Design a protein with these regions (language model features):
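Bacterial lipoprotein signal-peptidase II cleavage site
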Residues: 19-34
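Flexible hinge/capping segments at coil-to-helix
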Residues: 150-168
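Extracytoplasmic small-molecule ligand-binding "clamshell" domains
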Residues: 35, 43-124
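Periplasmic-binding protein-like
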Residues: 143-150, 213, 217-259, 277-284
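Extended ligand-binding regions for polar small-molecule ligands
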Residues: 35, 39-40, 85-94, 173-175, ...
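Short helix-initiation/N-cap motifs at beta->coil->alpha
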Residues: 83, 101-112, 156, 173-176, ...
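Short helices/loops that flank or line small-molecule/ion binding pockets
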Residues: 93-94, 102-103, 107-120, 134-136, ...
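A structural signal for short loop-to-beta-strand junctions that line the ligand-binding cleft
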Residues: 23, 52, 83-84, 132-142, ...
Length: 284
């Protein structure tokens, strides 16, 4: 009897041993399977989100602008017009979406772009190192310069930058005009946009302003609302481009749009409408 009990005990012990081994093997296999599955499911570097797909999905191209005649400004009915506005609208149409113009704080343009408050900065934007390092930009499409605005009755007293050392300037915050004020050691006050900078000079709050030459030609002098002002010396030469989010697939599409619209005459026709044809850079 005792022998039978011992035999049964031995058989039971062996059965438990095999059972545990089987369970252990199963766990190891499952762990290996999980590890293998995990490795297989880890994706590689994903491509950046397509801006084209993004704007087409929502149906709008939101264009960041400021009030900047002759590039972006409103007509009597409140519609946005200007060389940049018309080109932006045509580009949006080529994508099959609706253009939507959004006034921005120029100093925050990169933040607005990256935060997707806007999809593009298209507003006579100078291609500075700061801009091109923070955005992916189109090819240059327009020549420009930063130019000094003064009251016409004192302009002859300031023939060069050195003679302007004691003046107080108004400049758009974050603009190429501000860069030139700093580069020349001028005393300046930052304002919200270039139109306000001109207004500061007209009202006597500032002695002078630094704005884009294209805007100066449209806003200042005989036949304008600021016929008591004039523009004088150029402080630099520069080029305009259009800014997108880094990695955006819209950049190449816009460059091709520029080439096509230049070739078929559309670009120059729009430029002539707003008197900027002499500043256009050929798109080829």
């Amino acid at each position: 009897m005792n022998n039978m009990k011992k035999l049964w005990a031995l058989l039971l012990a062996l059965a438990m041993t095999f059972s545990l081994a089987a369970c252990g093997g199963s766990s190891d296999e499952e762990a290996a399977t999980v590890d293998q599955t995990t490795e297989e499911e880890v994706p590689g570097d994903t491509a950046p989100e397509s801006d084209l797909a993004y704007v087409q999905d929502k149906g709008t191209l939101v264009i960041g602008i400021t009030e900047f005649e002759p590039m972006d400004y409103q007509d009597a009915d409140g519609n946005w017009i200007g060389f940049d506005a018309d080109m932006a609208a045509a580009f949006a149409e080529s994508l099959g979406v609706t253009p939507e113009f959004q006034i921005i704080d120029w100093d925050n343009k990169v933040m607005e772009l990256d935060g997707k408050t806007i999809d593009v900065v298209w507003n006579g934007m100078t291609l500075t190192d700061e801009v091109t390092s923070a955005m992916d930009c189109s090819n240059a499409y327009c020549n420009n310069a930063q130019i000094v605005i003064l009251p016409a009755d004192v302009a002859d007293q300031y023939p060069d930058a050195a003679s302007m050392a004691d003046l107080t300037f108004a400049v758009e915050s974050g603009s190429a005009g501000q860069e030139q004020a700093e580069a020349n050691g001028f005393t300046y006050t930052e304002v919200v946009d270039q139109a306000t900078a001109v207004l500061e000079v007209a009202s006597g709050t500032a002695d002078a302003a630094i704005i884009d030459s294209l805007m100066a030609a449209a806003m200042v002098g005989e036949g304008t609302s600021y016929d008591q002002l004039t523009y004088t010396i150029e402080l630099n030469s520069e080029e305009y481009g259009v800014g997108f989010r880094q990695g955006s697939d819209l950049v190449d599409l816009l460059n091709q749009f520029f080439v096509d619209s230049y070739a078929d005459g559309t670009l120059m026709e729009i430029a002539e409408t707003y008197g900027v044809q002499a500043a256009i850079i050929p798109q080829e």
